[in-house]
Amino acid sequence: MDGVGLCANNKQKQNQMLPNKMRGEFTRNQRKDSEGLSEAPDLEFEYSDADKWTAELSELYSYTEGPEFLLNRKCFEEDFHTHLPDQKWTELDSVQRRAHAMRLLDGLEVIGRERRLKVARAILYMAQGTFGECSSELEVQHWMRYNVFLLLDVGAFTALVELLNMEIDNSAACSSAVRKPAISLADSTDLRVLLNIMYLMVETIQREEPTDSPEWRTIRETFKSELGSPLYNHEPVSVMLFGMVTKFCSGHAPHFPMKKVLLLLWKTILFTLGGFEQLQSCKISRRAALGLPPLPEDSIRVVRSMRAASPPASASDLIEQQQRRARREHKALIKQDNLDTFNEKDPYKADDSHEDEEENDDNDNSLEAEPFPLERDEVMPPPIPHPPTERMCFPKGLPWAPKVREKDIESFLESSRSKFIGYTLGNDTDTVVGLPRPIHESIKTLKQHKYVSIAEVQIAKEEAFQKTPLSGGEEELELCATELLYQGILPSLPQYMIALLKILLAAAPTSKAKTDSINILADVLPEEMPTTVLQSMKLGVDVNRHKEIIVKAISAILLLLLKHFKLNHVYQFEYMAQHLVFANCIPLILKFFNQNIMSYITAKNSISALDFPHCVIHELPELTAESLEAGDNNQFCWRNLFSCINLLRILNKLTKWKHSRTMMLVVFKSAPILKRALKVKQAMMQLYVLKLLKVQTKYLGRQWRKGNMKTMSAIYQKVRHRLNDDWAYGNDLDARPWDFQAEECALRANIERFNSRRYDKNQSNPEFLPVDNCLQSVLGQRIDLPEDFQMNYDLWLEREVFSKPISWEELLQ
């Protein structure tokens, strides 16, 4: 009894030493989760532009749309057998298939909505691979590719864009949807069918296959250039889709199927601008064109070769380990002999002791461990050698080559000169007179690792254009897909960013339902709500999956735009980034990560039996509550891990080299949120978390750094080093009071000057416009005078010319 009372008193004292919030966490039973995390293997996740083709196809459809597959088939077969009785699509020759496809396209031009919808469903069935005549999923995929290229060749995409524009401008449908109290799947039928066909075409054509014929390759390149050019309604398709997003968020079109719009927008941007591999190759060629040295390494390859680090521990883990160890020591004093005898026979002893040792080894970095300084030697024992199979193999040396900016060299020289010789030389980075030999060596090392970014060259060129607008000459503007897209979205870019973040907020798992939030479930909720438990569970899975796909699409859209704009021109990137910051993107992403991120990544919100194309080939098994709860057998959810990495990369892009935005991370207390995300054992995700922790480390205080040494070691090991970057201490010159408004206003002024100079031709300074001073040229111009002026010409001549004294000598000089 005494022993029990002593343990209870110790436990009570330890609880009292904890902060209130942590005390609540400690009372929850988190042991199972934390132990599972510490023992969890690395997630075998390969980051890429998108998931497998079949996964991307299946995510287009909600499970509620399942019955429409057979409806599409029925519409196609009725029309097909009317013109070609007793024949199959797969048995026709290419001429017959082309003729039927063109016949269907003609049907899209009829006035009657019902007839037009039936034809659109028949075309959708073609794009879905005419699955009724296929016996396997591979066969469906084969006919999908064939039919989609055929549809594109006969001009289906242009017709679909025109129909989509007509549906967007359909005021009757919009006003009807606004008046409805509850919007369901039936309100967006026409839009969903059109968007489904367009998405299947873009998604299928953008994926190259080794077996593609030269004709298909030519069609793909032509489609890619047309999709990124203002050929459809005098604007790129992406701009039209952005317009749908803002119209939906403004409440004027609540029936728009937003998941499909966002997926099509993402794939259109991905296809026209290029993915991450193309970005890397474009960056290499752009640096070569500017005369800059090549990149020190291939960042994509380096990240793929990295291994995940062990996750840091939480306070509850540390305390439970101490209690467990105290209990073991107490038992050892009472029954040492009996325990020795038992341990000889205990088959789990080795595993248990190894588990404790490994946890102790992992849990040496928590700030919350500070209230127990006397027990630090117990909390942090010497490292235990791991078995060879579990040892993490790092390449010799650090994965990244260090980089130095010109600004870093200047500041180092300035501080050295003022310290040793008492004067400064401004921006001079060559004069080293009077400085000691070690400083010479330091400068030499810094210059060896000097890195000039494309952005620095672009900023310097822009400054030159602003300083010398006349002698600077005309800027050579390459009208690539990125430039055309920026010109298209520039007038309404702030509204587009706000709309995307609104939808992201509504789809985030941490968001609570509010009356003023937008309804993003219009294209997933059925007309009749479920009546059984099984139907409710299925709809719950569908809704969660729907939200996850929306988060995935928005995160990919934002990241692709930021990266492409930064490569095209840094001020395009800064314009978009600044509006994201003004729309509270930073706290929104932090709010997203302020959840059990491991549960989000391992969520099983999918029913593989209902995924396309599996559901149209195989018979649907009987769904039970147990099978819905079990989900699939995957270690993690690809789309959720993809979304998390994208959001971290966006956060990193917004805050990089921005002191005021880095301080926002500190003010919003992002460190504990980000530290929890390190529990996900995936190298790329950990890298971007560590980058975000690194930039704010010097502002978090000595106590935080002291209590998080394992995190500091991981930063040193995985994040690129900037020579002279005093990130691990608070001595940096940047650790100063910050003025968010001043920094952002200065940046905004530069952005506005850039946009005004390059895109606002009407607002050009009249002083710099060309003037025709030749008298003969001016008098020789033909000017059309209005009819009333010609009738009253004599009056004008008398009033304005004859009655006023004119010095013709001065005028002609």
UniProtKB/Swiss-Prot annotation:
Query: According to its UniProt record, where is this protein located?
Result: Cytoplasm
Family annotation (Pfam families): DUF3402, N1221
Q: Which SMART domains match?
A: DUF3402 (SM01293), N1221 (SM01292)
Gene Ontology biological process terms, A to Z: cortical actin cytoskeleton organization; cytoskeleton organization; heart contraction; regulation of cell morphogenesis
Q: Where is this region: Disordered?
A: 1-41, 307-379
InterPro entries listed in its UniProt record: Far11/STRP, Far11/STRP_C, Far11/STRP_N
Residues found modified as Phosphoserine: 310
Q: What UniProt keywords apply to this chain's record, in alphabetical order?
A: Cytoplasm, Phosphoprotein
Where in the chain are disulfide-linked cysteines found? none
The GO cellular component terms are:
cytosol; FAR/SIN/STRIPAK complex
Q: Which ranges are annotated Polar residues under compositional bias?
A: 9-18
Bias-annotated ranges (Acidic residues)? 353-367
Residue ranges annotated as compositionally biased, kind Low complexity, are 307-316
Comp. bias intervals (Basic and acidic residues): 22-35, 331-352
What is the stated purpose of this protein? Answer: Plays a role in the regulation of cell morphology and cytoskeletal organization. Required in the cortical actin filament dynamics and cell shape. Part of the striatin-interacting phosphatase and kinase (STRIPAK) complexes. STRIPAK complexes have critical roles in protein (de)phosphorylation and are regulators of multiple signaling pathways including Hippo, MAPK, nuclear receptor and cytoskeleton remodeling. Different types of STRIPAK complexes are involved in a variety of biological processes such as cell growth, differentiation, apoptosis, metabolism and immune regulation.
**Stated family:** Belongs to the STRIP family.
Subunit record text: Part of the core of STRIPAK complexes composed of PP2A catalytic and scaffolding subunits, the striatins (PP2A regulatory subunits), the striatin-associated proteins MOB4, STRIP1 and STRIP2, PDCD10 and members of the STE20 kinases, such as STK24 and STK26.
What is the protein name stated in its UniProt record?
Striatin-interacting protein 1 homolog
Give the organism the record lists: Danio rerio
